[in-house]
Amino acid sequence: MTIPSATSLRRFTALVGTCLSLTMNADAAVEKILFNFQTATNSPAWQVVNDDVMGGVSTSQFQVLTNGGAVFSGVVSLENNGGFASVRSAPVRENLNGCDAFVFRVRGDGRRYKFTVRTESGFNAPNYQAEFTTKRGEWEEHRLAFKDFVPTFRGRVLTDVPPLNPANIASVGFLISDQQAGPFRLEMNWVKATGRPN
C-alpha cells in the first residue's frame, strides 16, 4: 500500500477546502443595502406625494431622525375623492440582478401599506406595488418578492406592461391607500434587496 506524502495530503486538504468554499459561496445569499436610515449619510432626500395632486387633502411628512431611523407619518383624508399619501426616494438607479426580493425593517401602526418601485423616473411612469400589513408598535422585517409586484398607474392595475425589471430600479417608496381616514405612522430602519445567485 502506498502512503500519501505530507505534501500530497496538504494539497488534498487545500483542494477540499477550496471546493467547500466555492460551494458555500454559491449558496450564499446576495444582499444589497439600498437605504440605511441609521446612517444619515446614506439617507438622501425623499419626496412626499399625496392625493393633493388630484384634489385630495391628505397630508404627510418624511423625517430622518438625528438619533437614527426615519418616520413617514401624516393624516389620510377621504375627502374630495382622495385617500392616499406616499413618499419615494430620490433616484437610485440600481441594478438588482441576482436579487429576488426587497426586505425592510419597519414599525407600524397596524395599518396596511404598500412598498412601491419605479423603473422609470418620469411622472407618468408605472408604479409597481406590493402590500404588507404592520403590527401596531412592533418592529418587523417584511420580505416582498419581485414577482409579487403589480404594475399600476394612478391606482389602476396595468395589464399591458412587463413585470418588474430588477436591472433598472429608479426609485422605491412607501404608500398608504387603505381607504381608512385618520393618522398613520410608519417608522423604518433600512431597505435592502436580497436573493441567491442562480
Locate predicted features.
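Beta-rich carbohydrate-recognition modules and glycan-binding surfaces
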Residues: 2, 24-198
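Bacterial N-terminal signal peptides
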Residues: 13-23
